Curated annotation (Swiss-Prot):
HAMAP family: Rel_fac_1. The modification N5-methylglutamine is found at residue 238. Belongs to the prokaryotic/mitochondrial release factor family. GO terms for molecular function: translation release factor activity, codon specific. GO terms for cellular component: cytoplasm. Its main location: cytoplasm. Keywords: Cytoplasm, Methylation, Protein biosynthesis. It holds the Pfam family RF-1. It is found in: Cytoplasm. Peptide chain release factor 1 directs the termination of translation in response to the peptide chain termination codons UAG and UAA. Methylated by PrmC. Methylation increases the termination efficiency of RF1. This is Peptide chain release factor 1. It comes from Mesomycoplasma hyopneumoniae (strain 7448).
Length: 361
């Protein structure tokens, strides 16, 4: 193990011991807020400590076995020492690999819920139908994760699906699993209205944003907002409400426009629209920070129209993620079984982080 990494682990080990002692003091035991904060901090480094302790224990056994090999003349003891050295060396190598991954920098947004926006792009009616298919795919995946889905804003399309839909998924570490979904999703299939059996290509853009909680303050100057109200409408612009309950908010400095019409009241729609706006502004700043960093970790796309990340090929029952050259059967994925591709993307993220760490040394 490199000296720099070993020293870092020793510091974490000492911090763990200090926090454990602090947690048992009367001052902390009588302060529930501080107690929970320290307990959470301990939990965040417990796995690192457990693996590092195994590393230290096996390192000691290895050194003892090497000493026996040098000092002893007994053939039986020497043979046992050789077996011990081989076993401990293998264990230590595995612990080092695991610690390398555990020590990788964490994304501060990984624990957050998400707001997902899907828009029809190229392809007209077929693109809007595809938006509906993607929404169902994410909804089914969320159900499998015991996560909750709430539609925040939607615009129904005449031929089916949505021209746009914005929804929230709440659950355990949802952003960490869906942050790589941003980008252009392309579908290739024969539309139901196609009489000649020709394959059409359509696209939809997906943007995944961390949901901003109350702890994060996003400063928005009221004078930077233009707020319009209008009657909510259904597919094809048909009015479905007799009052101006729908809300459109324009953030003038960034040009971001958000709408909400699914709530019954104007107050409810304004609250939802402001929540979406805050997440969009936060996500915009997040993208700026990522652009300033190195070329690593480009998996989390910006959602730009030019950034094609995935193709859903129905005639060939094939899904391809172009960023990692990953192909698999389309049917399970479109039915919500996203975990194989999520796991492949997470594995690639870890690889890129390790490469980045070495590049920075």
């Amino acid at each position: 193990m490199e000296k720099k990494m070993f020293n870092s682990l020793m510091k974490i080990h000492q911090k763990y011991q200090d926090l454990k002692q602090l947690l048992e003091t009367d001052q902390i035991l009588n302060d529930q807020k501080q107690y929970l904060q320290i307990a959470k901090e301990i939990a965040s480094i417990t796995e690192i400590i457990e693996v590092f302790q195994k590393f230290l224990d096996d390192q000691k056994v290895l050194e003892d076995a090497k000493t026996i090999l040098i000092q002893e003349d007994d053939p039986e003891l020497i043979q046992l020492a050789k077996v011990e050295i081989a076993t401990m060396s293998k264990n230590i190598e595995e612990y080092e690999k695991k610690l390398l991954i555990l020590m990788l920098p964490k994304d501060k947004n990984d624990e957050k819920d998400v707001i997902v926006e899907i828009r029809g792009a190229a392809g007209g009616d077929e693109a809007n139908i595809f938006v509906g298919d993607l929404f169902k795919m994410y909804h089914k995946w969320a159900d499998s994760q015991k996560a909750k889905v709430k539609v925040l804003s939607s615009s129904l399309a005449l031929a089916g699906g949505f021209s746009q839909i914005i929804f929230q998924i709440s659950g355990q570490k949802i952003y960490s699993k869906l942050k790589f979904e941003s980008g252009v999703h392309r579908v290739q299939r024969v539309p139901a209205t196609e009489t000649m059996g020709r394959i059409h290509t359509s696209t939809a853009t997906v943007t995944v944003m961390p949901k901003i909680d109350e702890k994060i303050e996003i400063e928005i100057n009221p004078s930077d907002l233009k707020i319009d109200t209008y009657r909510s409408s259904g597919a094809g612009g048909q009015s479905v409400n007799t009052t101006d309950s729908a809300v459109r908010i324009t953030h003038i400095p960034t040009g971001i426009v958000v709408t909400s019409q699914d709530e019954r009241s104007q107050i409810g729609n304004k609250e939802i629209a402001m929540g979406i706006l805050k997440s969009k502004i936060y996500n915009l700043e997040l993208q700026k920070q990522q652009q300033k960093q190195s070329d690593f970790r480009k998996l989390a796309g910006s959602g730009a129209r030019s950034e094609k990340i995935r193709t859903y090929n129905y005639p060939q029952d094939r899904l391809t993620d172009h960023r990692i050259n990953f192909s698999t059967s389309l049917k399970p994925i479109i039915q919500g079984s996203l975990n194989p591709i999520i796991e492949a993307l997470l594995a690639q993220e870890k690889t890129e982080l390790i490469l980045q760490n070495y590049a920075n040394k």
